[in-house]
A protein has these predicted regions:
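Non-transmembrane, aqueous-exposed alpha-helical and coiled segments at domain scale
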Residues: 1-185
């Protein structure tokens, strides 16, 4: 059994997310938000616009995946060429990248919510680890110098796909002030 599992519902950061993040930081120049240029904001934008790629799509109907790729390339190419004066995405390149991802992650993909639910039923201990802290939360942090996903403990259950009442203990680490990577304040 692998020591790491990847949810079949996991969204994937694509190389063009990193490119878009980099292009946007350059466009904003001195007024940027200090991105780490790892593609996180464009990734979340795609996730919530329902145009991101889910791991399960890699193992589904290839024609549907190619249709999704065509839709994404059409949308992204408007932004890439019109706003950033950057090269267009090629459908074949996006498809090939996704197939590389598929090959890399195939042994690790499963229904992680079911896996965790079974662990709960067996009385096993589950450790959920969050990131950053409340001052970087998009709803409760120092906006706009926040991250793109919720950093609060309550979202641990949501992200893991387990009922919130199964979280029995929360341990937090708090700092006296907020700090960040990139050009964050």
């Amino acid at each position: 059994t692998p020591k790491i599992l990847i949810s079949d519902r996991c969204q994937m950061v694509m190389p063009y997310h990193i490119d878009l993040d980099t292009y946007e930081e350059a466009r904003l120049a001195g007024k940027s938000y200090g991105s780490t240029k790892s593609g996180i904001a464009p990734f979340y934008s795609d996730k919530y616009a329902k145009i991101g790629f889910q791991v399960s799509e890699l193992f589904g109907d290839e024609a549907e995946l190619k249709e999704h790729i065509a839709k994404v390339c059409t949308l992204k190419n408007v932004m890439l060429t019109g706003l950033y004066n950057a090269p267009e995405l090629k459908e074949e390149d996006v498809f090939n990248t996704l197939m590389e991802y598929k090959e890399m992650i195939a042994p690790y993909v499963c229904d992680t919510s079911l896996y965790l639910w079974n662990a709960i039923q067996e009385g096993k201990t589950i450790l959920l680890e969050g990131q950053l802290g409340s001052l970087k939360d998009p709803d409760h942090g120092i906006y706009p110098m926040v991250t793109s996903s919720s950093t609060l403990a309550a979202y641990g259950a949501i992200g893991a796909g387990i009922p919130p009442y199964e979280i029995k203990k929360i341990v937090t680490v708090c700092k006296a002030y907020s700090s960040a990577v990139g050009a964050g304040e």
